[in-house]
Regions:
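Aromatic-anchored glycine-rich loop motif in surface-exposed flexible loops
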Residues: 1-78, 82
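Extracytoplasmic/secreted envelope proteins and their assembly/folding machinery
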Residues: 7, 18, 62, 66-69, ...
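Secretory-pathway/luminal and periplasmic proteins that interact with or process carbohydrate-rich
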Residues: 17-28, 103, 120-127
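Helix N-cap and loop-to-helix transition residues
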Residues: 54-57, 89, 125
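Aromatic- and glycine-enriched pocket-lining scaffold segments that form the walls
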Residues: 76-117
Length: 188
């Protein structure tokens, strides 16, 4: 893949992460735009700026999310993750943007983005959804997913999930090397 694709995927992944973080650490968008949410960290910040980074407002976080998704949509235009579905592509970006617009109660924009997200997909038939379903990323209706196999686990402990090796609560996570991470949590 080209650097353009990698950059688009990185922006989409950051938007996805902030979309989840802002929902976990603050009330939803409408009516709470000025409430403090989470700090925003970007690649343009210096180390000093990252370490002295106050919590951004909900509005600022959503502005960052939409900026990242808009850039990602441009960079990933025409890119399709194919049958593997383990990479962020243009359809996934529009799906994420639809979700962000729903949370901001921008219903018309959400509908447009959702239409763009599913335009290349194949909805499941009534017969398909009448049996246990939504359990395989190989389904035509899935936009993004990872097919977990014994060959693609990210750690050798038998735990096969993405955040398991990033967690600071484990002795084996990458973030466990940050000894004073919890002392830096803003309690305001």
């Amino acid at each position: 893949a080209s650097l353009k694709i990698y950059r688009g995927q990185a922006l989409a992944a950051r938007a996805y992460d902030y979309l989840n973080l802002v929902q976990i650490y603050q009330f939803t968008y409408a009516g709470h735009e000025n409430a403090l949410a989470v700090p925003i960290v970007t690649e343009k910040m210096s180390d000093e700026e990252m370490h002295n980074n106050p919590r951004a407002t909900v509005q600022q976080v959503y502005d960052q999310i939409m900026s990242d998704l808009n850039q990602a949509a441009e960079l990933l235009a025409g890119f399709d993750n194919g049958a593997n579905k383990d990479q962020l592509d243009e359809a996934v970006v529009y799906g994420l943007r639809a979700r962000a617009n729903l949370l901001m109660q921008k219903w018309a924009d959400a509908a447009k983005d959702a239409e763009r997200a599913i335009a290349g997909g194949t909805p499941q038939s009534l017969a398909e959804v009448s049996t246990p379903t939504f359990n395989s990323a190989t389904a035509n209706s899935w936009l993004w997913g990872v097919m977990i196999t014994p060959d693609n686990d990210v750690v050798q402990t038998g735990i096969i999930n993405w955040p398991s090796h990033l967690c600071s609560l484990t002795g084996n996570g990458y973030t466990s090397g940050v000894p004073d991470g919890y002392r830096k949590v803003n309690t305001d």
